[in-house]
């Protein structure tokens, strides 16, 4: 069965595979822009905006926890945490692996700490439960079953009562196939980036949103998307409805 998505305005969107998404990222970073820092900032701000929207009037006094991996997905989550801290929310974070942090993600971590974000061990009973957890552990670069600290954090997250928003792809879900080779996050909401992927099955993502990274239309066309039409005419965040045909 083929997975299709539709926007609130009725635009039909055919999902893409991970290799196509990698090519879109490559073209943007190496040739056209926006660069990696800019796309990470756009991803984080979109995630922060969606978080504030979902919190609504309950945002005052809310606590957010960011679970961040070492790469671009983790950087987007940490960036979102900084924006939320700037808007008055209490923001904590934990890292899947501090030693492997990429340069751009490390920069986002420094900015979050400057905004008041604090590192915690969420598994510790002393930490307490967050209102919302931002899952930014793995993203579309999953290779096999999550292991080590990432697997531990996923198990802990699924056992709790916090509302979960996954960034791009629920951690542990194969973005191409929708297969789950091991532990995987079970979010209420997923914000996927740039374009939906073929593995974003509705039973795995919860409510699905699409976030604009600011990539020029010509990049999508060069990557092989025929008759490209931007879904972001109405805004930076687009609600998607899935159907399997």
Curated annotation (Swiss-Prot):
Its EC number(s): 5.1.99.6
UniProt catalytic activity: (6R)-NADHX = (6S)-NADHX; (6R)-NADPHX = (6S)-NADPHX
Alphabetized UniProt keyword annotations: Isomerase, Metal-binding, NAD, NADP, Nucleotide-binding, Potassium
InterPro entries assigned: YjeF_N_dom (IPR004443), YjeF_N_dom_sf (IPR036652)
Domain of life: Bacteria
Residues involved in (6S)-NADPHX binding: 72-76, 139-145, 168
Record-annotated YjeF N-terminal domain positions: 21-221
Cofactor(s) demanded: K(+)
Top-level enzyme category: isomerase
Entries under Pfam families matching the protein: YjeF_N
Cofactor remark: Binds 1 potassium ion per subunit.
Function: Catalyzes the epimerization of the S- and R-forms of NAD(P)HX, a damaged form of NAD(P)H that is a result of enzymatic or heat-dependent hydration. This is a prerequisite for the S-specific NAD(P)H-hydrate dehydratase to allow the repair of both epimers of NAD(P)HX.
Family listed: Belongs to the NnrE/AIBP family.
This protein's name: NAD(P)H-hydrate epimerase
Species annotation: Dehalogenimonas lykanthroporepellens (strain ATCC BAA-1523 / JCM 15061 / BL-DC-9)
Gene name linked to the record: nnrE
